[in-house]
Amino acid sequence: MNARLLYVRKYPWIILLLLVAMVLSGTAYAQQRTVKGTVTAGDEPMPGVNVLLKGTSIGAVTDIDGNYSINIPEEGGTLVFSMIGFQSIEEEIGNRSEISPVLNEDIAGLEEVVVVGYGTQVKRNITGSIASADLSRSSDDINVTEAMVGVPGVQFNETGRPGQVGNLLIRGQNSLSGSNSPLIVLDGIIFSGNLNDISPRDIKSMEVLKDASSTAIYGSRAANGVILITSKGGTTETPSISVNTYTGISDWASELKLLSPERYVQRRLDWRAQSGLDADPDLIGNYLSTTEAENLQNGNSINPWDEIAQQGRSSSVDLNISGRTKATNYFLSASLSDDKGLVYDDNQKRSTFRANITSTIKPWLQIGTNTMFSHRDLSGISASVRDAYRTSPLGTMYYEDGSPTQFPVPDEQAAGNPMRTSLISDNEEIRENLFSNFFATVDAPFLEGLSYRVNFSPSFQWNHAYNFVHQDKNVSFNNTSASKLNERQYNWVLENILTYTKRLGENHNFDVTLLLGRNHVEAESTTATGEQFNVDVLGFNNLGLGEIQRTNSAAYSVDMVSYMARVNYQFKNRYMLTLTARKDGSSVFSVNNKYATFPSGSLAWIVTDEEFMRNLAFLDMLKLRVSYGAVGNQAIEPYQSLTLSSTQRYVFGDGGPSSLGVVTATLGNDDLTWETTKTANFAVDFEFFQRRIAGTIEYYNSNTENLLVRRNIPVMNGYTSILTNVGEVNNRGLELSLTTDNIRKEQFQWTTDFTFSHNKNEIVHLFKTDLNGDGQEDDNIANSWFIGKPINSYYDYEFDGIYQEGDEDIPAGSQPGFVRVKDLNGDGVINPDDRTVVGSGNIPKYQFGLRNNLRYQNFSLSIFINAMQGWIAPFNLINPLVPGRSLNQLDAGWWTSENQSNNRPSLVYSNPLQTNWYMSRDFIRLRDVTFSYDFDQQLLDKLKLNGLKLYVTGKNLGTITDWLGTDPENGGSYTSEQGSDNLYPIPKTFLVGLNVSF
């Protein structure tokens, strides 16, 4: 069947909705008239000015001569003339048929306000490296982490699993053993929850702080960058109600190609032939296990992927009510979402609630709260992807009564039934988060510009995971077991913030911010297990029924105190200076290094404000920025600087019962100190041709010193290792963001956003030892740490093809079809000395993002493509390893004398060198396509609505890659129960949604 026709038949509802939108777009207009004119600035015509009928989507754009023409309803209204860099003008139409306004240049130029941490700044005055995630140009269903894709310097690797946030990095990896995740700040308060706790529809803005100048205000927590999330507030004087809902389905974007029964049989025959054994196709039943032979004879087979798959589905409803009065600003929201993954029993249900309220008690006093509660239900044990790709297509998944087998091929037991654990288990996993901030702001009546704000932010997290494994009636032993895990965390933040803003004459502006803060965290967890239940009716609700019982518990607390000062200064509104210093103290370090100070400074110069630049008509804005500073990373768990004890049993004398005693377990280190990252940043911001082209180029160079690493020590000391500060890691790179306004027409607009990021990560120093005396610092092969190479590089033999029949250089012990590796030292012998760093896979060398936004009348289309280039990862499924058994059923091909592949080994190759098989993870992906329609104002008036938008979104629609797994994005960055060769699919998703406001 024609592929396009098949698509229409499979998703007819999408086509129907598009037809409905087009029909409604033709709703009869009331009687109209035309208004025209010319827009100027001074004596010059102004092309590209937006002309909009206020309160509607009716608009036009001035041509190259500044002329416009717009059709409006007979009753008239108000025209709004706007353009970046100029003050907007509103003109009442009345009976006029011609309106020619004169725009005045916005003196501030870039008046966009950006959240910078402990306050806001006009974008023009920013001196540090801050990037914004443009939520308005993303699909309405997008989650919080996906909004970061395409932000220069930000790397996000998706997992494809419901409820999982994936891996998020800003400008590479800084720490060898500590966390490399960025700090999350929600509404000005450090957020310790999961990003999936936050409803995307509650977010007003997201900023990414990347250099030391912008992150130093967060001191010891900011070495990996900072993401600032600001939630919404009320914007209209009358109450506004908004509803967003969507529903959609997901499917496999790329399914792992497994052996068909025919290919499975052929592989067994080829293996026997290559092994010198009989390989008669008529006797294949003798070469298979009993189960496989019976299924082959009876024509029974399975596709393990089909067995574990479920139809992916997504649905969500968001409701918010907002508004403002003279005394109160409020935003109230609730959301419900239900996501089913592509693998059986892998799901998430989420509900969130938010209340943002600010009240003006007196002209000088405001109080308020930002409170959020989330409830996430992750119950269920997903089917095993790992067992699925190991399962023979001739195996048996279920007995005749429908109960799951323990092993699809019982004779071999090489792979468990991927569905068994899911089907015989009850699982409940709930995660809840209550995050709040109560604040008061006082504007000093005795000194203009002085204000004081106090934040008190208590937050609670409750997690529990309960599991019960029922008796499998097909096994002869008692396999029942149960476990209950309960976790609780309480966290409070108290901040006192003093700000002072002052203007001195015409040329001097400055503001000062001072902070005194405290942070307390306490957490505890309890685990109880039971085994061998004779009664399983109560499941995990009565662990006392188990014959074997165990309990375990843990608790910790951390305290921090912080002091911060920041000064922003502008001279003539073109020279900017920012100085910041923060001092942090933490209980995780001993008394010797409990405190650390992190300073930074930055400068900016708006070159185009200089007199000598005024005659460059094509250049609208040129700004230079430079910054340098230091930030920190605690990077260790509580109590790691102390000498810790543990219990151990010992038998005295010649025997008898053991006694429980206390022994020292780890060696403390009073000199442990903070990891420190020092970063230099250089940037150029530019705008050309009346802001039709705008962008930023940045170069950064950061060094992280005093890395917290556990180092091996001689066992004669009584310990095997000690936590120390050693080594240095460098990250340097280049970032580009470019926005072009390609077409500005009355009925059609087209803009493009392009981003590029390059990061080079390398280890500069480790332990500064030279044990072999070769004059070079020693690497740490055990941890894959190599001087001059990226963190977690791959150290292995270098693949050089496959030995073929007729080759004259086949060494002893090898044969045609075996792997050839390079003799790097040229001694004629392949041994461990021939290993080298073959690549790295955590961070791509290059990232690209390209988004095109097109609008025709009320229709909008957004297309986003992203790419990651320059990284590899092991993909060991290429080698069957044990082809004589039902292990690893990837159909990647294999070497035979009839088909002499140069990149796949023969079936008898046993990989004696234990070489990994590496593949490129490079990809180019059509990540997001969104088509939307904004209904006409006249229809909205009839329905008494403020807004109505219908949209259709397709995500992960196509990927160009050589990666043989399900997806290269999560190919090496995520470790789960499926193993290091992660094969969990990132879904292809189609959504249809509706936004309604009234």
Where are these regions (language model features)?
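Short acidic/polar hinge/loop motifs at secondary-structure boundaries
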Residues: 68-71, 146, 182, 187-216
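Residues embedded in well-ordered regular secondary structure
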Residues: 129-132, 137-140, 150-157, 161-169, ...
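Conserved small-residue
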Residues: 242-296, 724, 741-842, 962
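Flexible loop and strand-edge segments within Gram-negative outer membrane beta-barrel domains
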Residues: 252-254, 295-335, 339-346, 352-433, ...
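Extracytoplasmic gating/loop element in the C-terminal half of outer-membrane beta-barrel translocons
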Residues: 294, 392, 401, 405, ...
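Small-side-chain secondary-structure face that scaffolds active or pore-lining regions
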Residues: 341-352, 372-387, 432-433, 439-534, ...
